[in-house]
Amino acid sequence: MMESGDRQNNKIGIIGGSGLESIELFTVKDKVNCNTPYGKPSSSLINGTLNGIECVLLSRHGDSHDIMPTDVNYRANLYALKEAGCSIILATTACGSLQEELKPTDFVVIDQFIDRTTKRHSTFYDGQNVQMKGVCHIPMRNPFCEKLQNVLLSACNVNNVSCHSKGTMVTIEGPRFSTYAESNLFRKWGGSLINMTTVPEVVLANELGMLYAALAMVTDYDCWKEDHASVNVENVMKTMKVNRGNALKVLVSAVEIISKQNLQPDIQLAEKNAKNSVML
């Protein structure tokens, strides 16, 4: 397993989702095009500082948002961020709501997921990389870092952004949206939100011993709500314009909060758990 002690750390990696591909957050130091044993990441890595705090930005869907969810190279993205010295990951993701109380423009700090993907590489331990030998059975009872979840919640509160402290994300394969039957099924399963990117991203972060938390930005009610328009690209993009400004403010505050905390023991524990999950 890759260990953070082998490189300068612990930088904060920010994975931007739909509507957050801009680098205006940063004082940019450089832009690095890199390769990994799993191929090229979705975008260049943007190294820079946010109020003097070292961060690395990666655009999940590419600089021009031209990579569909199935084709995102999640393994390369996480591997590249780890190699760049990131042990802490803050991710943003646009999503639909499966529950009445989670309204468009609300934010949600995800704490669980339901995996409905079918076509993605979900582990680094596929026998192809000599650095990743064996089979990894990573525990997923609590996939997201609780301390980072609290950071995101605090950052939302500081900025007076409506945010819910927990939610179960249903990640579908996409790129199509759900049917009415699927949307209602996911609601019955206990799903709170629906998107196309949380899995396998959070799983892979755990395999690398990274602390990971995701800020979900609600854009719509999917297609289950009878008195609300069904999800479509036009309406999603309109809501994302509203969400984007709030998301940037929250990320700035979150980075500042993290910089004042000592997360090294948590990182070491995450790396130990990842290492102990590998059967050789």
UniProtKB/Swiss-Prot annotation:
Catalyzes the reversible phosphorylation of S-methyl-5'-thioadenosine (MTA) to adenine and 5-methylthioribose-1-phosphate. Involved in the breakdown of MTA, a major by-product of polyamine biosynthesis. Responsible for the first step in the methionine salvage pathway after MTA has been generated from S-adenosylmethionine. Has broad substrate specificity with 6-aminopurine nucleosides as preferred substrates. Substrate binds at M196, D220, Y221, D222. One of its GO terms (biological process) is purine ribonucleoside salvage. It comes from the Eukaryota. Its EC number is 2.4.2.28. Keywords: Cytoplasm, Glycosyltransferase, Nucleus, Purine salvage, Transferase. Phosphate binds at S18, R60, H61, T93, A94, T197. The lineage of its organism: Eukaryota, Metazoa, Chordata, Tunicata, Ascidiacea. It comes from Ciona intestinalis. Signal peptide: none annotated. This is S-methyl-5'-thioadenosine phosphorylase. Gene3D superfamilies: Nucleoside phosphorylase domain (3.40.50.1580).
